[in-house]
Amino acid sequence: DPGAAVSDYRQFLEAKAPVPAEQGTPIEAGDIHPMLFPHQRAIVEWAVRGGRRAIFAAFGLGKSVMQLETLRLVTPTDARALVICPLGVRAEFVHDAELLGIDITFVRRTDEIDGPGIYITNYESVRDGKLDVSLFTAVSLDEASVLRSFGSKTYISFLQLFEHTQYRFVATATPSPNRYKELIHYAGFLGVMDTGQALTRFFQRDSTKANNLTLYPHKEAEFWLWLSSWAVFLQSPADLGYPNDGYQLPDLSIEFHQVTTDPSRSLKEDRDGQGRMAVVESLGVESAAAEKRDTT
């Protein structure tokens, strides 16, 4: 039967598609805190069901709220969850946790952990081995892009540290689409696909320039399909078909102010005897004060 043969071949091809399995738990809409906006509720439901997912959302779309609610729903009541974030972001999580009615505890060392619940720490505490991450069932990396600044050694250590963590999430602002290395590093952390396997499967290397990755032309569609199976990219709620109410900025109003100056002021020499054709930027307090005085 030709039809059956085509169907079997289609199933064979679909089985080869690298779509990650769902490793979380399904939830009902009523399980999610009513405070969340529709786009946040949809992402939380998707993340909890997946168990290992990435949330790439632009500033202001509620990454901290979504992470907290996801961890609350995915973590058993007798287990612990951990948010890892830059130190300066801690206050934002504490504030959002209060809005959600979630108790969250900041810790730097293992001996500060006491009982089940949601904890929060900074990247340095994990990097320096001060915190035993094996005590946590779920983890979410906030502003995960900061791992780039720590270097590849820290990234590799994070891969190893959380290799056996059941639920893993990353959240950061939308990465540039051409940051392929960053995207597959996230996939490696989440356990979606080994970094080396992703490099071999999707990319051709540039022998003339290190780390210059180019997608195989015949793999482009598969790559973006694979990416969308474990990561959500969001610039506005409208990207998911939800209203933009509260997220639409007013039209930009530009007002021009012309400051008149004396052109002869620029005809001076600097301390090295070099002539100046224009007034240079004032960086110091003294020069800035002089500039304000001369242009008022």
Model-derived regions: residue spans:
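Short hydrophobic/aromatic beta-strand immediately N-terminal to the Walker A/P-loop
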Residues: 54-58, 82, 169
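Conserved Walker A/P-loop ATP-binding site and its immediately adjacent core
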Residues: 64-69, 78-100, 177-183
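Conserved helix-turn-beta segment of the N-terminal RecA-like "Helicase ATP-binding" lobe
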Residues: 88-111, 190-194
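Conserved helix/coil segment N-terminal to the catalytic DExD/H
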Residues: 110-138, 149, 153
